[in-house]
């Protein structure tokens, strides 16, 4: 939904559904033998997003979201009796705020320069593996992302975009206890660089999304 004002600014908002999946591998050793674990993650959720843009292309945006995250890992651990896997399911909650500016490059393309801050909280879970209890603590993620994105073919319903961004994770610590004994903390804290290429479908020229 979008509302345009007499001063040339625009406010838009909407509700959304989100879904994603990914795969990963772990590498461990037991009794001088190395073994690989294969994992997968799936999340489903939804939320609400809003954005305000003035006539000069400067905008602010924000969102709230919540959902469920499922994680499955095969061959996660091994002992003399064989290998073991586990499954976890946790709720997640998140929010983000952002600011940016849209710069017109031509009639059919523009440049989006932005900065965004993301906060996500994922609840912990407990599993039993081979009779032993493992407790996974909750995880808090705080990320700052700055980047730029170019969108071309804006005059068409299908436009293309590509961009680069730098991201820094301020938190991301993951703690676990096994039978009451605390394991070493695993952390995602640090810098990363990302690139993106994609397509966007805009059903009408006046659509805000």
Task: State where each predicted segment sits.
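Membrane translocator/pore-forming domains, dominated by Gram-negative outer-membrane beta-barrels
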Residues: 1-209
């Amino acid at each position: 939904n979008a509302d345009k004002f007499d001063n040339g600014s625009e406010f838009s908002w909407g509700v959304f559904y989100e879904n994603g999946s990914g795969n990963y591998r772990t590498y461990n050793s037991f009794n001088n033998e190395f073994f690989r674990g294969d994992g997968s993650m799936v999340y489903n959720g939804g939320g609400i997003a809003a954005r305000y843009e003035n006539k000069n292309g400067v905008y602010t945006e924000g969102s709230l979201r919540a959902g469920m995250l499922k994680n499955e890992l095969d061959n996660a651990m091994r002992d003399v009796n064989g290998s073991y896997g586990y499954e976890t399911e946790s709720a997640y909650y998140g929010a983000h705020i952002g600011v940016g500016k849209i710069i017109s490059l031509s009639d059919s393309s523009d440049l989006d320069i932005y900065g965004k801050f993301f906060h996500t909280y994922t609840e912990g879970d407990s599993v039993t593996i081979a009779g032993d209890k493992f407790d996974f603590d909750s995880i808090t993620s705080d990320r700052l992302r700055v980047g730029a994105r170019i969108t071309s073919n804006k005059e068409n319903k299908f436009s293309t975009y590509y961009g680069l961004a730098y991201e820094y994770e301020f938190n991301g610590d993951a703690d676990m206890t096994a039978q009451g004994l605390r394991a070493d903390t695993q952390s995602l804290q640090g810098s990363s660089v990302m690139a993106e290429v994609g397509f966007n479908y805009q059903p009408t020229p006046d659509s805000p999304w």
